[in-house]
Amino acid sequence: MIDEFLFLNFDKSKITAKYLYKKLQREGQLERDVDRLVRNDRIAWGSSMIACNDADAMVTGNIRHYTASIEKLKKVVDSRPGEEIFGMTMMVSKGKTILVADTNVQDFPSSQRLVDVSKSCVRVAKLFGFDPKVAFLSHSTFGKPVSKNTQHVRDAIELLKKEKVDFDFDGEMQPDVALEEIYKELYPFSKIVGNANVLIMPSQHSAAISYKMIKSMSRAKVIGPLLIGLGLPIEIAPLRSSTSELINLASIAAYSADVIDYKK
């Protein structure tokens, strides 16, 4: 564990502190407070280094809770213009890759947030070379059984239809309907049934429970969660991440830094 930082180039630390002070000066932060923050907080220091082009990407977390890390990050790093910040997890099993969101940030997303998350997931899926097929998940499938808890998912579908997006989507549906081809006979009207590779969860708790159960009980390879929508190439490692998990996150952060124009 790193308890303190040793700055090998003190002038660079002054530059990063100056950058962060300019960002936070109208949010109640004095210059000496920001200088102390850069010296003592690895997230503030690392993200400011990336913003000042003194680093390309960053992986943080691992020894603190994910929520604590994301809250610190959101104070010093903005989201990408027009995007929400959320967690997306990749799961690879039987030669198929599935993207699941939001697994880590928003407890109970609104219909509009589900729409925004789905569009960001599609952007990421295309970066990874996938043809996105988006399923909005629920405990019901196309209105059966009826429940007020599924209405925000159904509303998200209607909102997305109005936007005339360039990807296939459908819902609401249960996960087995989204993933298993046997259900195509029951729902021949849907292009997504049995073909989904992007799963939009109705809430964070259902997403987190699902992917952690799969990670613990199956042979599926789980990568992430990846932090999507942040204005810099930064990933947060969950508590007690393994060496291979850290390497995966570092590779994805580096890839993001290379292919995404964060200055837009």
Name what the model sees in each region:
Residues 1-264:
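Anion-binding alpha/beta catalytic cores of soluble intermediary-metabolism enzymes, centered on
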